[in-house]
């Protein structure tokens, strides 16, 4: 029997009296204050005597239930409706008042929220990140609908969300009310009851009774096509394997039972389902709620205590040395002035007294301040005459540093770095042996890391891993400096920029942690600069250790699959929620290797290189790993689209002939193998965003980040390719000498004349000026191309001459 909606309406209205009598609070047996069934004559005097008392108790009970409902709704229902829309808001609220308070209490217990909003529900923050597939929905009748035209949606997840459009229609339009209850039924079956043990055991008899009925009315009302077509009786195993189908039936039955003018339809066509809902009483819901609380460890204290208990023996067995090591991991050790001064030779001390630190272009502000403090301490040993002499020397800050002074400050720069294990692991991608730090300190890092690895021997275990989520708040810039400044809305810092967020999310598929993650057992409020809120599910074999104050330290070198990225709102401020699951790092490494193989095959073909040439390398080890890989495609396409193909092929072949690479990485550039042969400028390159290494003929690009004057990583890559053009042009001029063309007298003279006419970074030296001019000449912005021709015409002509020379060689 194919039940039409119109028919349901007629039946519903014809049974309106019945419906009204059945529309009291559901699942909760109410005391009937006046009269009842049975032998009235025998008890009429007693009942009349107690009538007032029963009525009073009844009113008190209903009042208690109403207060309980209001208290729950205060916690889970958020009204986001303008003042003039109050009538629409109230209509939606009245729908929720018909839902049993115990159902809403279970929803509250799992962290669920209900939002009543104006207009298009897809514009709500919780639904903005939905995929296009999930925006195609079906209503309770199986009719297709587009979410932006619909009025209610239940979003599943660890903390489910129900979004309801405010509308007066719910008062008269019972179908709209029915669909709201249908979505609530989905939450009840999918997000709550499915989490308890044997959730469908009692529902099995209901389904089989409907299936074996003499007519198909109950199936037509509630069953999905798959359930209708199932040839035999349903078993528990079948229901467990087809839980979505069962949840659909439950949600429909719930909706028909709750909506007053449709309740009689359920009783008429599927009486077994009606009786099931009718008996789904307060006691059963309470049992479900208790089981749910126990299984999900909803109490924050209980969750904390269980983890502490799991790691109690581990904590008790820690030696003082082990505790000190974990403290060292959490709190970087700042350098001590006295230790640094003591390590200096007398000659170095004399040099430090006279160096004009402000004129150093490779020291950070913090480093300059620290070195000035060293100078002050050393000056105490000067005579008054020497101090006066030193003051006169330092008045003129325009004097450049001598080469000797530069080399000394480069050495000293390493000595003033904090001893920070996690930062070191992040900078190197866990490759501790890279030579970007002096040997003694490197050995200390290796010892400490090996000892911490040994401490973290206990896994989280199968009893805990699937029941807990761990949390980490993160500064956006620690993940992506490119988008970090733009992700927060510039007009309202409580909001996230939607356009930038979509770009941020698009390439975020997997992650790697090469250092030790320190995570919170329970989510904590974010600091001002923490706008990323990670929620991480562990694997049972994740090794961890318990720290004080509700934190765990996780092993290094783990993989993370990104399950969802969405904007959430907490305390009137928007954050980005990243849901991730711990997986073996090897699984993520395989994804990266497959992507590297694919991109090399594509570009080898495009550039006419041998099939198995390994031109492109992904040296990726950190938390925004997938973005490095995905962005490489965009960077290379923009490079190809903005530079002459003949020039690209000629220069790329030159690089390949020298075993050169295009290295896309998220670790600092001095730690890249292709850079090891080029260590004389290692100190300046710690924070470099890009680098061309003539010795290895390789372009290194650090991301996700951008330089001071670069709009994106593509411009950085074109700048570095400009250095490769400089190198190849010099090689063609004299293959024996193989010097940069920018070292020619002709270009040195051009630099003296035009070197200050383009960008501040271009003023650094001849090579950087050439690369900056090359970048501007191949910009997607026509105005920047003209800028070189107008402001540096000789440079423009010189570079064009080199391009023609290379192409025709």
From Swiss-Prot:
IIB: region residues: 420-583
Localization, UniProt: Secreted; Host cytoplasm, Host cytosol
Residues holding Zn(2+): 719, 723, 761, 768
GO molecular function ontology, one term from the record: zinc ion binding
Result of changing residue 720 to C/D: Loss of activity. No effect on zinc binding
GO BP, sorted A to Z: proteolysis
Comp. bias (Basic and acidic residues): 40-66
Chemical reaction(s) catalysed: Preferred amino acids around the cleavage site can be denoted BBBBxHx-|-H, in which B denotes Arg or Lys, H denotes a hydrophobic amino acid, and x is any amino acid. The only known protein substrates are mitogen-activated protein (MAP) kinase kinases
Sequence repeats: 315-333, 342-357, 360-378, 380-397, 399-416
Key word Nucleotide-binding present: no
Protein name, entry field: Lethal factor
Organism for this UniProt entry: Bacillus anthracis
Source taxonomy: Bacteria, Bacillati, Bacillota, Bacilli, Bacillales
């Amino acid at each position: 029997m194919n039940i039409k909606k119109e028919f349901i309406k007629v039946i519903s209205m014809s049974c309106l009296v019945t419906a009204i009598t059945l529309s009291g609070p559901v699942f909760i047996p109410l005391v009937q204050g006046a009269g009842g069934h049975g032998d009235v004559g025998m008890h009429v005097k007693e009942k009349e005597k107690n009538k007032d008392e029963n009525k009073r108790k009844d009113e008190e009970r209903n009042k208690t239930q109403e207060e309980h409902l209001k208290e729950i709704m205060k916690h889970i229902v958020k009204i986001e409706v303008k003042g003039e829309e109050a009538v629409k808001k109230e209509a939606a609220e009245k729908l929720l008042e018909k839902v049993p308070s115990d159902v809403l209490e279970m929803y509250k217990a799992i962290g669920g929220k209900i939002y009543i909003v104006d207009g298009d529900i897809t514009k709500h923050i919780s639904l903005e990140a939905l995929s296009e597939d999930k925006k195609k929905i079906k209503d309770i009748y199986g009719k297709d609908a587009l979410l932006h035209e619909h009025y209610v949606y239940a979003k599943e997840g660890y903390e489910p969300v129900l979004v309801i459009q405010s509308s007066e229609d719910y008062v008269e339009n019972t179908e709209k009310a029915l669909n709201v209850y249908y979505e609530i039924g989905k939450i009840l079956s999918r997000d709550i009851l499915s989490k308890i043990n044997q959730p469908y055991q009692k529902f099995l008899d209901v389904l089989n009774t409907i299936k074996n009925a003499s007519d198909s009315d109950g199936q037509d009302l509630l069953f999905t096509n798959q359930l209708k077509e199932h040839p035999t009786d349903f078993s528990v195993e079948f229901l467990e394997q087809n839980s979505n189908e069962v949840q659909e039936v439950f949600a429909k039955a719930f909706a028909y039972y709750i909506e007053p003018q449709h309740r009689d339809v359920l009783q008429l066509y599927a009486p077994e389902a009606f009786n099931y809902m009718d008996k789904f009483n307060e006691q059963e819901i309470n049992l479900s709620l208790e089981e749910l609380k126990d299984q999900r460890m909803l109490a924050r204290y209980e969750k904390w205590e269980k983890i502490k208990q799991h790691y109690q023996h581990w904590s008790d067995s820690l030696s003082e040395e082990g505790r000190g090591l974990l403290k060292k991991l959490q709190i970087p050790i700042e350098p001590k002035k006295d230790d640094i001064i003591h390590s200096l030779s007398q000659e170095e001390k004399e040099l430090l007294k006279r160096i004009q630190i402000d004129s150093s272009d490779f020291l950070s502000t913090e480093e300059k301040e620290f070195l000035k403090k060293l100078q002050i301490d050393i000056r105490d040993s000067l005579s008054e005459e020497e101090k006066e002499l030193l003051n006169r020397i330092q008045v003129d800050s325009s004097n450049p540093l001598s080469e000797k002074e530069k080399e000394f400050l480069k050495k000293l720069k390493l000595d003033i770095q904090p001893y920070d294990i996690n930062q070191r692991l992040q900078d190197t991608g866990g490759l501790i042996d890279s030579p970007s730090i002096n040997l003694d300190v490197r050995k200390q890092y290796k010892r400490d890391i090996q000892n911490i690895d040994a401490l973290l021997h206990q896994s989280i275990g199968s009893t805990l891993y699937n029941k807990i989520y761990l949390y980490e708040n993160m500064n956006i810039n620690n993940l992506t400096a490119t988008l970090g400044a733009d992700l927060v809305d510039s007009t309202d810092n409580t909001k996230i920029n939607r356009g930038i967020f979509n770009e941020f999310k698009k390439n975020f598929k997997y992650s790697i942690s090469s250092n030790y993650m320190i995570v919170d057992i329970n989510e904590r409020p974010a600091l001002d600069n923490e706008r990323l809120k990670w929620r991480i599910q562990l694997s049972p074999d994740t090794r961890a250790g318990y720290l004080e104050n509700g934190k765990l330290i996780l092993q290094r070198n783990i993989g993370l699959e990104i399950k969802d990225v969405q904007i959430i709102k907490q305390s009137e401020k928007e954050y980005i929620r990243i849901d991730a699951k711990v997986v073996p790092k090897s699984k993520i490494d395989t994804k990266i290797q497959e992507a590297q193989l694919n991109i090399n095959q594509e570009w080898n073909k495009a550039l006419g290189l041998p099939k198995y040439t390994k031109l492109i390398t992904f040296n990726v080890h950190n938390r925004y790993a997938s973005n490095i890989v995905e962005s490489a495609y965009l960077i290379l396409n923009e490079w190809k689209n903005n530079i002459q193909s003949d020039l690209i092929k000629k220069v790329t072949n030159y690089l390949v002939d020298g075993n050169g690479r295009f290295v896309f990485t998220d670790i600092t550039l001095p730690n890249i193998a292709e850079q090891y042969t080029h260590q004389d400028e290692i100190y300046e390159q710690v924070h470099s965003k890009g680098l061309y290494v003539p010795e290895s003929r390789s372009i290194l690009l650090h991301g996700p980040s951008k330089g001071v004057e670069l709009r994106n990583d593509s411009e950085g890559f074109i700048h570095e390719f400009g250095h490769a053009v400089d190198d190849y042009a010099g090689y063609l001029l004299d293959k024996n000498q193989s010097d940069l063309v920018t070292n020619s007298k002709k270009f040195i003279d051009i630099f003296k004349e035009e070197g200050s006419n383009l960008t501040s970074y271009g003023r650094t030296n001849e090579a950087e000026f050439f690369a900056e001019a090359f970048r501007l000449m191949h910009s997607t912005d026509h105005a920047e191309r003209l800028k070189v021709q107008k402001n540096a015409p000789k440079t423009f002509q010189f570079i064009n001459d080199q391009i023609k020379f290379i192409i025709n060689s």
